[in-house]
Amino acid sequence: GGARPRPRGDTRAKLAVPLEAVYRGDSVRIGVNGRTLEIKVPKGIKPGQSIRLGGQGGNGGDLYLEIEYAAHPQFEVDGRNILYSLPVAPWEAALGATVSVPTLGGSVELKIPTDSESGRKLRLRGRGLPGQPAGDQIVELEILAPRVHDDAQREAYEKMRDAFGDDWRRA
């Protein structure tokens, strides 16, 4: 007998991909067996789907990279939708405002309706992950009270307190 050829070995690995790469269809670099490979991320690829790299596995087998989304400092993912929590000042919520909101495709202007409350969700159509249909970005308003840094700001809060009184919670 002589030496038997070793069987081809397909290799499987997980690949955490930045949301921006999934949104735009960017390339990412990975290290495989001491080499650096540049991989094109298909636009809108879903977690659990795989990218096959022919001949990059063990013994000339294929390498299958199972996609997962890397954690993002600002966004969460729900299916194809992107979730974002937007800090809003009390006067923006009460009076309405137009504010800049980050999305995976860059900042956009969002109109906050008057009399908005914390937890209200606003939809930016088509600003989620690509696909058929594309996802949306869901912006949840989080009303926060700014800290007081000087006498003018303290006086503004005191005027609000005097104007609203103690029974504003029941309104």
In which residue ranges do the predicted regions lie?
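Post-J-domain flank of DnaJ/Hsp40 co-chaperones
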Residues: G1-R29, G58-N59, Y64, F164-A171
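Glycine/acidic-rich beta-strand-loop module
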Residues: D10, P18-G25, G31-S50
